[in-house]
Amino acid sequence: MQGSVIEFLKPNLVGIEQINATRAKVTLGPLERGFGHTLGNALRRILLSSMPGTAVTEVEIDGVQHEYSTKEGVQEDILEILLNLKGLAVKLEGKDNVLVSLTKSGAGPVTAGDITHGSDVEIVNPEHVICHLTGNAEISMRIKIESGRGYVPASSRIHTEEDERPIGRLLVDATFSPVERIAYSVESARVEQRTDLDKLVIDMETDGTLDPEEAIRRAATILAEQLDAFVDLRKVSEPVAKEEKPEFDPILLRPVDDLELTVRSANCLKAETIHYIGDLVQRTEVELLKTPNLGKKSLTEIKDVLASRGLSLGMRLENWPPASLSED
């Protein structure tokens, strides 16, 4: 069938070759000459930089104050452990960030499967090695995992001097993209008498948290949405009324008494006019340790109780307190 000389061919999905659970080849064609590289390069850049995913952003290891130290009984130094933690492949369900914990003792490897987490967390690579213990050594750590996009260096998340970054909180460079490798090639294609057409072949590998086929679909959707504004430059879009969402997580509006702390810890917080959980999470460890009669034991209790609810000290809450919140 002979088409118009100005009519563009519309590509169709030629095939998907699933090489393994994390790698696939997607073939798209036929494409007009030159469009193989045009679409291939655009999709490649989006897949590498714009796919949402999860990453470890903060780590606290008992007995470790900074990343340049070592821990007795652990073969790897702290920098190696942080690097290994970056290799965790995690899925989060219904949450943007979570705190998980890991405690292990005795000689042998410490793997991602040793991490204690809730039902809203799935570790895709439980066999991933984090470190190795010798003798009767023990290691205990708390790991913060967040959702995000692209690459966010630790330097961009370091607290200001006014925030007094807590000692022992180790920030990690976060690579959120689930796409680990992608390459594309353009091959020749033929339709009837035309032999100058392109066929795009995308070879992609992910960390297992995102199916390669779904990743291609998301990248194409992002590209289409970004180009949609150019379809009708004169079109004036009307503002869409957004559904109002709670300004703060309801748990932050609850009184500190709901944490069921010991009497000593609760009284210390009330003496500092810390009445709501939202007041508490904005305080840093250094600030709390300056509170009269509040020692390290009480601080550990507070941190553990917050961690069990997916919270931590040193959080930033914009526009706190809300106008509707009444002071005790």
Curated annotation (Swiss-Prot):
UniProt keyword annotations, A-Z: DNA-directed RNA polymerase, Nucleotidyltransferase, Transcription, Transferase
Function, in words: DNA-dependent RNA polymerase catalyzes the transcription of DNA into RNA using the four ribonucleoside triphosphates as substrates.
Protein family: Belongs to the RNA polymerase alpha chain family.
Ranges for region Alpha C-terminal domain (alpha-CTD): 248-328
One Gene Ontology term from the biological process aspect of the record: DNA-templated transcription
Gene3D superfamilies hit by this protein: 5' to 3' exonuclease, C-terminal subdomain (1.10.150.20), DNA-directed RNA polymerase, insert domain (2.170.120.12), RNA polymerase, RBP11-like subunit (3.30.1360.10)
Reactions mediated catalytically: RNA(n) + a ribonucleoside 5'-triphosphate = RNA(n+1) + diphosphate
Database matches in SMART domains: RPOLD (SM00662)
Region (Alpha N-terminal domain (alpha-NTD)): 1-234
Designated name of the protein: DNA-directed RNA polymerase subunit alpha 2
EC code: 2.7.7.6
Complex formation: Homodimer. The RNAP catalytic core consists of 2 alpha, 1 beta, 1 beta' and 1 omega subunit. When a sigma factor is associated with the core the holoenzyme is formed, which can initiate transcription.
Domain remarks in the Swiss-Prot or TrEMBL record: The N-terminal domain is essential for RNAP assembly and basal transcription, whereas the C-terminal domain is involved in interaction with transcriptional regulators and with upstream promoter elements.
Broad EC category: transferase
